[in-house]
Amino acid sequence: MSENSNHHCIIVGIAGASASGKSLIASTIYNELRAKVGDHQIGVITEDSYYKDQSHLTMEERVKTNYDHPNALDHELLCEHLEQLMRGEAVNIPTYSYTEHTRTSEVDVMTPKKVIILEGILLLTDPRLRNLMHASVFMDTPLDICLLRRARRDVEERGRTMESVFEQYQKTVRPMFMQFIDPSKQHADIIVPRGGKNRIAIDVLKAHISRLLKA
């Protein structure tokens, strides 16, 4: 946990494997804290928005990118945006297309918040991001469960074939999990088993955020 003394906003990072329940627990905390801090005082930022722009590459080249490696992400821009939000400045968050494998021309404007929830697979691998967090979480969901969830999500929501999902899992998802993501849980303040519906973990996180807000 960072000893960050900037009180403009509280940043909570939620990391873990793809389809481990990060988005679910982030959205649950977001929805349940809105009544406490106000609709416009809490926001969620997904690390996926900061995949590097690949518009200069052909589609064939884009699909070969290893999206589970830290080099695929623009963490420098993410850090800059978080620092701007902590200074009370609005930022333009990129939007990423999972079907085009690059950023779109649109941006999402985020105004300063009291609480920002970050979620993404590689957040805890970067010391710059860890230093900006007031609390960090790792979703410790078994990989076989993550794979089943990911396959269903990517086929239903992202236009992928089952064959391409399993091929990507074997070539990059699992190896990168073992090399980068799983070791990063040593940096987490809280390790959450059983996925995003872990009610005790949700309540602990909400209570901790509430304490930080009162500090």
Swiss-Prot record:
This is Uridine kinase. Pathway: Pyrimidine metabolism; CTP biosynthesis via salvage pathway; CTP from cytidine: step 1/3; Pyrimidine metabolism; UMP biosynthesis via salvage pathway; UMP from uridine: step 1/1. Pfam families: PRK (PF00485). One of its GO terms (biological process) is UMP salvage. It is found in: Cytoplasm. It is an enzyme of class 2 (transferase). GO terms for cellular component: cytoplasm. Gene3D superfamilies: P-loop containing nucleotide triphosphate hydrolases. PANTHER family: URIDINE KINASE (PTHR10285). Keywords: ATP-binding, Cytoplasm, Kinase, Nucleotide-binding, Transferase. The keyword Repeat does not apply. It comes from Aliivibrio fischeri (strain ATCC 700601 / ES114) (Vibrio fischeri). GO terms for molecular function: ATP binding; cytidine kinase activity; uridine kinase activity.
